[in-house]
UniProtKB/Swiss-Prot annotation:
InterPro entries: LuxS_sf, Metalloenz_LuxS/M16, S-ribosylhomocysteinase. It comes from Bifidobacterium longum subsp. infantis (strain ATCC 15697 / DSM 20088 / JCM 1222 / NCTC 11817 / S12). The lineage of its organism: Bacteria, Bacillati, Actinomycetota, Actinomycetes, Bifidobacteriales. Signal peptide: none annotated. This is S-ribosylhomocysteine lyase. The keyword Protease does not apply. Involved in the synthesis of autoinducer 2 (AI-2) which is secreted by bacteria and is used to communicate both the cell density and the metabolic potential of the environment. The regulation of gene expression in response to changes in cell density is called quorum sensing. Catalyzes the transformation of S-ribosylhomocysteine (RHC) to homocysteine (HC) and 4,5-dihydroxy-2,3-pentadione (DPD).
Amino acid sequence: MTEGKAEKPVVESFQLDHTKVKAPYVRYIDTETGPHGDVISNYDLRLTQPNKQAIPTGGLHTIEHTIAVLLRERIPGYIDCSPFGCRTGFHLLTWGTHSTEDVAKALKESLEFIAYKATWDDVPATTEKSCGNYRDHSLFAAKEWAKQILEEGISSDPFERKVV
């Protein structure tokens, strides 16, 4: 930086070497402690290999809506699960900390439901009133991508395949 200017914040995900990871995986990113001692953890739920594949928005959007319910049922302290702009996965935020193995198992169970059991009735918030882009959903694409991700296996480690 030039003299007199503040240092720019470091964005962790921009520091990750995306050429070294082996998707699909769950990666623990960081834990933040708030002013009252509350702990929030951030996880990288990477579903596809960066710079090789990206999930089309309709499928990703449907996965997002569906796992919003499914992961809440499986992960205590679930706060939010938001898609990456690159469409290769999600950030998961939780109160407290969880092992990557537990998060990977919860993700696997959720994707199994999407791939093999979900019907349109299982996808929440798909109306104009409840969704900001309700026309951009595809249960077919969500199911096909979930099957592919499950076939590849979800690892609890981003660099070494430890499939759960």
